[in-house]
Amino acid sequence: QFDAYNSKSKEDSSFIMFSKSNDQSLTWSEPLRISKHGGDCIDDDNTVEGAVPAIGPNGEIYVTWTGPMGLVFQKSLDGGSTWMESEIVLQEQFGGWSLEVPGIYRANGLPILKCDLSNGPNQGNLYLNWCDQKGGEDNTDSWIIKSTDGGVTWSDRIRVNQDGSNKHQFFTWMTIDQSSGYLYFVYYDRRNYDDTQTDVYLSASRDGGKTFVDTKISEKPFIPSAEMFFGDYLNIDAVDGQIRPIWPSMKDKKIKLHVALISEKGLKK
């Protein structure tokens, strides 16, 4: 929530609010502020935003977002009635969440939170995926941390993209196939080029985020233009071994949407 969007006044703040519906979205509960610490309203690195919820196997509600404190985490164990006294900081987000990537009008590195609800060995695991520039301003990467105890403790960060090229990987998004517990990530990737040519890659993890295998899924690269707003997110879903990443590409300042029809059986192992 913004007191006044784009306001530069120190009197205006941004916060994270929570509301829920018990009747299929017909009515909603009174919004409850769940971020103890706020940010500014400029819609930049010091703004609190990018909240993504995830539901645990026993109805736990988990939320992550980012802002001046870095990547933070909140949770409720009673359906959203009460929350932790304050959000906890999970990671520094190097370069902030509003990243500078050549050829991109605005490159968000906002976090994505998912929970394993499968019947597999990693049921209940929380996974947090985001992009930042820990490797330097010319080396954006996709990262993940995980929790196996409901967000009490978290692993060290692990890099999702396995190229080691010191190039940009950005606009990450992830999903979990709840039939298997496998993790899938989609992101833009420039590992193969020295300019702004951009491919799309998918990474898969079949061991709860310990190891990853990369696959290029775009047929050919495209060259974006920083003069044109390109959107803020990619997306991906996976059900019963069928994986559907979706992304935009750009040619001559015209945007096209793409979806890939991918089967787990056909991916590199």
Describe every region a protein language model picked out.
Residues 1-269:
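Extracellular, repeat-based ectodomains that mediate carbohydrate processing or recognition
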